């Protein structure tokens, strides 16, 4: 937002220069992105009067003008502007003058001497977007008589500094001069007062009828002004608008824009003779079309709020007026509109039509719902000032006054929050400087919040206001106060996580961090249980709309990204949190720490000394078991073949810690891999919180046995569908302390075997830490193993 320094000074007694003011405003919480002096690099530019204009004798498009600049000698100036003419008051840059990027010298143009230049506004540095259309292709002409030789910089209001403010969405009140005046009053500890409208309220009755049929319109005022004269605005009004980044159009439109800047209240003027006596505010109907003021024909949607004459749309409410009721030079009677529209409705309409305006920008952020009457009175006052013969009818419409919110807070609450000591009187003074009403009862303050400040609703908001005005720089730098200190250190869980990261990085894994937000579809992929989703209310994109319930989708996307860039051998690890909703919006989602891995390609693929090996299920399983070995849980872990959505139906297993399901491991389903252009890819995922909580035991060290081990091999036939885990569990069920190791060393499937059978061979290791085992002792236990396997259904070979 562009703000005039000179305009601001009309509301407050500011002595600071523009740069110091900008610094103070920024420290108060409203960022000033820049300060520009409009007359920078402009000198020796004055007001002149064109006394004569003659055609250049040797150039068809040039004119030779005699210009009076209030000096004894008249200036001869050659000018090529198509709109220059005798009898005009113009801007003259004399010889020796400087303009942005130009220094004026005496010159000859096609043989005729020129003693200066008649200037356009663009040549003075004004942006073409704010120059009145009638002067865009030529020089600027003053509409009224001016003092000859007067400094054109002062006459045009260019002796002004423009502050470029970056207004955050919560501070819509600062999108107006009055709102900024309140802010400056608080920052400089000055009382801000505004002159009431001088317009008498004894207007004649009106025939205008206003009907509001949409909930998106809370307040709507219409007021008829007759017998106006549409013409160019006076210079003071034009310069106010141009300095604020708005192009002057005509006096009526300029007044509505001026009130927009002054009050922050968007307004609109309709040609009453094109509207009639009826205004109906409603939602658009299917098939309705409106040509807006920018000349675009827009097909309306049922969600659009429109202003109608009772039959057809005449404006897109809060966004832009319609071409069919535009104020023109022939307009004699107008209807002024001052309304409060729902911010969400305006934002939706603006986005749907790709149409933004100064009005919609303010409605979207939220304006003061009690400002409509004051704004329309100010507009009427200005119209009567510029059109003395105009007559005004009484305003009519729907007004729902909004009550001021109250927030109760205490002095101690503010001081405790900020870590400072302010008295109740000091806090009250700060809040009252913001034009808040404060009722004091001991140290308790009941603060009434003006309706222009919708951003303030809770105690913390008031704390922020106090420290903004008190000054962040006034906070003393102090060390925290501690009654006692405790030695810092990592928790068991933190140490375990750090240790696992180091181990996996040492094994060649890349530690990965992915977004916690995924698409709605991805949020429930690769989950073992059904949980409620945790969705954002207003996601930036649909691909990042829901909190993840598994780390696998993010890892697979990372694998896909890298494989597409020719990184085919990957081992990725991620330790991160997943989120499970409860189905109750009032209950926080449960956060659980997971560990996941993804592997694809080969190992040792670039090592000349070792043969490469393709990553398979057992490669992934070996890496997963590193976790359990590090945490001393390897004997408690078991695997169960299972089908999981998105995983290969024959190469996937659930992982159990005791009787508790903690995760899974397996190959990504070939269809999923094909969709992502991946080769065989294996993943594993476990609930790390569960694993760490089970491992919270101190490590126990045992002496390596001094006695020899005895091994016995067993070969057997089992069903093809039998899992090795089942065989392992049968042997473990013997529950003999002498069995210290069970290893699978051979697996065979072939036509020589019985139909539906496979051959497996195991080595069982027996040992005793206290003595050397005898053959009889080993045989006794081994026979129990054979019997258990026989009962299971295995055929011992």
What kind of feature is each model-predicted range?
Residues 1-198, 335, 354, 358, ...:
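Phosphate-backbone binding interfaces of nucleic-acid-interacting proteins
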Residues 113-127, 134, 307-406, 562, ...:
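Mobile "lid/hinge" segments at catalytic clefts and subdomain interfaces of large enzymes
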Residues 407-411, 415-570, 712-715, 765-767, ...:
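Extended, well-folded interaction surfaces typified by the phenylalanyl-tRNA synthetase beta subunit core
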Residues 188-211, 387-413:
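Terminal amphipathic helices with adjacent charged low-complexity linkers/tails
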Residues 2, 433-436, 514, 585, ...:
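A carboxyl-terminal module marker
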Residues 47-77, 250, 256-324:
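Conserved mixed alpha/beta core segments that line enzyme active sites in large multi-domain catalysts
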């Amino acid at each position: 937002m562009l703000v005039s320094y000179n305009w601001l000074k009309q509301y407050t007694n500011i002595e600071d220069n523009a740069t110091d003011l900008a610094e103070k405003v920024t420290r108060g919480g409203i960022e000033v992105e820049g300060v520009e002096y409009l007359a920078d690099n402009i000198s020796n530019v004055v007001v002149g009067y064109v006394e004569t204009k003659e055609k250049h004798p040797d150039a068809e498009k040039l004119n030779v003008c005699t210009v009076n600049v209030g000096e004894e000698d008249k200036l001869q100036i050659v000018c090529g502007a198509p709109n220059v003419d005798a009898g005009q008051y113009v801007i003259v840059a004399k010889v020796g003058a400087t303009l942005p990027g130009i220094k004026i010298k005496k010159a000859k143009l096609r043989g005729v001497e020129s003693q200066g230049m008649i200037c356009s506004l663009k040549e003075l540095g004004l942006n073409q977007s704010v120059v009145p259309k009638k002067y865009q292709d030529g020089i600027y002409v003053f509409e009224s008589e001016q003092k000859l030789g007067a400094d054109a910089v002062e006459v045009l209001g260019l002796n002004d500094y423009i502050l470029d403010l970056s207004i955050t969405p919560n501070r819509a009140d600062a999108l107006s001069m009055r709102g900024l005046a309140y802010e400056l009053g608080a920052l400089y500890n000055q009382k801000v007062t505004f002159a009431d409208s001088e317009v008498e309220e004894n207007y004649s009755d009106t025939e205008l009828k206003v009907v509001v049929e949409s909930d998106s319109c809370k307040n709507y005022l219409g007021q008829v002004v007759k017998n106006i004269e549409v013409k160019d605005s006076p210079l003071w009004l034009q310069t106010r608008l141009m300095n604020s980044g708005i192009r002057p159009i005509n006096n009526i439109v300029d007044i509505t824009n001026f009130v927009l800047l002054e009050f922050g209240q968007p307004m609109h003027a309709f040609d009453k003779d094109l509207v009639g006596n009826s205004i109906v505010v409603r939602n658009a109907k299917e098939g309705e079309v409106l040509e807006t003021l920018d000349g675009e024909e827009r097909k309306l949607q049922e969600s659009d709020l429109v202003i109608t004459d009772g039959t057809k749309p005449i404006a897109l409410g809060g966004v832009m007026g319609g071409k069919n009721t535009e104020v023109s030079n022939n307009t004699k009677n107008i209807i002024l509109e001052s309304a409060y529209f729902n911010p969400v409705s305006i934002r939706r309409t603006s986005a749907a039509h790709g149409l933004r305006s100064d009005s919609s920008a303010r409605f979207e952020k939220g304006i003061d719902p009690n400002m409509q009457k004051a704004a329309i009175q100010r507009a009427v006052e200005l119209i009567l000032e510029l059109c003395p013969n105009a007559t005004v009818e009484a305003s009519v419409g729907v007004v729902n006054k909004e009550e001021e919110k109250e927030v109760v807070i205490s002095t101690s609450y503010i001081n405790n929050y900020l870590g400072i000591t302010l008295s109740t009187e000091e806090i009250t003074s700060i809040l009252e400087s913001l034009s808040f009403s404060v009722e004091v009862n001991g140290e308790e303050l009941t603060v009434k919040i003006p309706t222009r400040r919708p951003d303030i609703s809770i105690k913390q908001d008031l704390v922020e206001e106090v420290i903004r005005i008190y000054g962040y720089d006034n906070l003393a730098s102090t060390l925290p106060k501690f009654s006692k200190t405790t030695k810092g250190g990592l928790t068991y869980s933190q140490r375990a996580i750090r240790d696992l990261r180091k181990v996996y990085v040492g094994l060649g894994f890349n530690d990965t961090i992915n977004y916690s937000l995924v698409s709605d579809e991805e949020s429930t992929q690769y989950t073992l249980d059904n949980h409620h989703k945790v969705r954002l209310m207003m996601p930036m994109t649909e691909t990042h709309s829901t909190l993840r319930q598994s780390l696998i989708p993010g890892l697979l996307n990372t694998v896909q990204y890298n494989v597409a860039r020719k990184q085919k051998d990957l081992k990725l690890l991620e330790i991160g949190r997943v989120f499970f909703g409860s189905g109750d919006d009032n209950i926080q989602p449960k956060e659980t720490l997971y560990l996941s891995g993804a592997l694809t390609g080969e190992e040792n693929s670039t090592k000349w000394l070792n043969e490469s090996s393709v990553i398979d299920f057992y490669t992934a399983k070996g890496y997963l078991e590193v976790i359990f070995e590090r945490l001393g849980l390897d004997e408690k872990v078991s695997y169960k073949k299972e089908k999981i959505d998105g995983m290969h139906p024959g190469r996937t297993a659930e992982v159990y810690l005791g009787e508790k399901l903690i995760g899974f491991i397996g190959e990504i389903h070939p269809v999923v891999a094909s969709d992502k252009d991946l080769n065989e890819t294996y993943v594993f995922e476990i609930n790390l919180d569960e694993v760490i909580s089970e491992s919270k035991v101190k490590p126990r060290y045992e002496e390596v046995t001094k006695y020899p081990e005895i091994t016995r091999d067993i070969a057997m036939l089992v069903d093809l569908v039998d899992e090795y885990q089942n065989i392992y569990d049968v042997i473990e069920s013997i529950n003999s302390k002498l069995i210290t190791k069970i290893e699978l060393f051979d697996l065979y499937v072939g036509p020589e075997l019985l139909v539906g059978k496979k051959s497996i061979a195991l080595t069982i290791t027996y040992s005793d830490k206290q003595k050397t085992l005898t053959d009889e002792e080993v045989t006794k236990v081994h026979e129990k193993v054979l019997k258990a396997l026989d009962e299971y259904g295995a055929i011992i070979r």
